[in-house]
């Protein structure tokens, strides 16, 4: 096929590994980041479908992971003078980003409220959880954004702080993988 012409003699796995996570669909990219973070936090992975991706029994912390390409049209405006390869070629839409993060935080609050005294982990075991009346339930929202978004770190942190004040969910912004060319 013509679209494979420049990959002749190259293993498909090598081509796939060079594809930025940010070129994948939202769902595919999100699942990949959840798997990656579950791998980085052994024994904390939660079974799919619970509304929570990680659970730390020691601190009674429920965590969910979402990815957000802040350079996508939904979350930023492209500055026509740039070529789209630098973060400075974009102006972030603060209110759109905040609305999305708040929706994620509210969904996490609902998911945690629906969890009783145990949660099924990704390895199939049931893990005991402490109810709010016994031990405070910490809620953390991890938002994975493109590496280049560090240019907007202060704005993103400001939004994260507002979400925590408004919802009680701590928001951690993490920067992974490049999304822009150049």
Which residue stretches match the model-derived regions?
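Catalytic toxin/effector domains delivered as secreted proteins or via bacterial secretion systems
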Residues: 3-182
């Amino acid at each position: 096929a013509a679209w494979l012409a420049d990959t002749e003699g190259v293993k498909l796995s090598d081509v796939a590994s060079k594809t930025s996570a940010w070129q994948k669909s939202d769902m595919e990219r999100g699942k990949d980041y959840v798997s990656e973070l579950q791998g980085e936090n052994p024994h904390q992975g939660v079974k799919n479908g619970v509304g929570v991706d990680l659970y730390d029994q020691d601190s009674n912390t429920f965590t969910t992971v979402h990815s957000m390409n802040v350079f996508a049209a939904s979350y930023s405006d492209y500055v026509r003078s740039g070529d789209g390869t630098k973060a400075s070629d974009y102006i972030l839409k603060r209110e759109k980003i905040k609305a999305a993060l708040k929706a994620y935080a509210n969904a996490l609050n609902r998911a945690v409220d629906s969890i009783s005294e145990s949660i099924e982990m990704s390895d199939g075991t049931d893990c005991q959880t402490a109810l709010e009346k016994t031990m405070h339930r910490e809620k953390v929202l991890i938002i994975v954004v493109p590496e280049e978004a560090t240019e907007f770190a202060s704005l993103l942190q400001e939004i994260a702080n507002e979400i925590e004040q408004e919802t009680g969910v701590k928001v951690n912004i993490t920067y992974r993988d490049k999304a822009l060319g150049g």
